[in-house]
Design a protein with these regions (language model features):
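Acidic, low-complexity Ser/Thr/Gly/Pro-rich repeat segments typical of extracellular/periplasmic
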Residues: 1-114, 119-121, 137-143, 166, ...
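Short, acidic, small-residue-rich periplasmic hinge/interaction motif at the N-terminus
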Residues: 170-172
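Structured interaction patches on ligand/partner-binding surfaces of diverse proteins
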Residues: 50, 126-168
Length: 177
């Protein structure tokens, strides 16, 4: 469930039905996204080609912004997205768990849907580290060239492409070295 919650919900399933039990209280007027990642497979062990997203809201509308693009140089990439709260957060975002995570398709495409207006930072990482805070000393990652991605009401940002390098980088302020 995205954005990430302090306490993960409990899943109960029987047959074709899944029940999601929220241990945390939900924020008012917030759009939440239930993500089914590519690890889900059928009885023949065939995995999903792309992750699936379902949205619900605790308010009277579901947010409708989106950010999409391609991760280059990776067959197992994941896009990590942080909503930036303030100026200080714009340089320290990678030290906290991403607000949103989405596995890219085999061809590298990803799409975050149901996003609220605001400023976001995005990076690509191998999906084995998906959903984790970034440790620049231990993880390969790629940043988008824009310092932040501004999303307005009913706004779709396309072609937010990211190159995932072959060697480790270092985040220094907002510049990738």
């Amino acid at each position: 469930v995205l954005p990430n919650m302090k306490k993960k919900p409990t899943l109960k399933y029987k047959g074709k039905k899944i029940q999601i039990i929220f241990e945390d209280s939900l924020i008012k007027n917030q759009t939440y996204i239930i993500v089914v990642n590519r690890n889900l497979c059928d009885e023949r062990n065939v995995k999903l080609a792309q992750g699936i997203q379902f949205a619900f809201s605790t308010g009277n509308k579901i947010d409708d912004g989106s950010i999409s693009g391609k991760i280059y140089n990776s067959k197992t990439g994941s896009a990590q997205l942080w909503r930036i709260a303030d100026k200080d957060d714009s340089t320290k975002f990678y030290g906290r768990t991403p607000d949103y995570s989405m596995d890219a398709s085999d061809s590298g495409y990803y799409k975050f849907q149901f996003l609220s207006p605001g400023n976001y930072r995005i990076l690509a990482i191998d999906n084995s580290f998906s959903g984790l805070a970034i440790d620049p000393e231990k993880m390969l990652y790629g940043l988008h060239c824009d310092h932040s991605i501004q999303l307005k009401q009913m706004h779709n940002r396309k072609n937010i492409n990211i190159y995932l390098p072959d060697k480790k980088n270092k985040i220094q302020s907002h510049i990738l070295i």
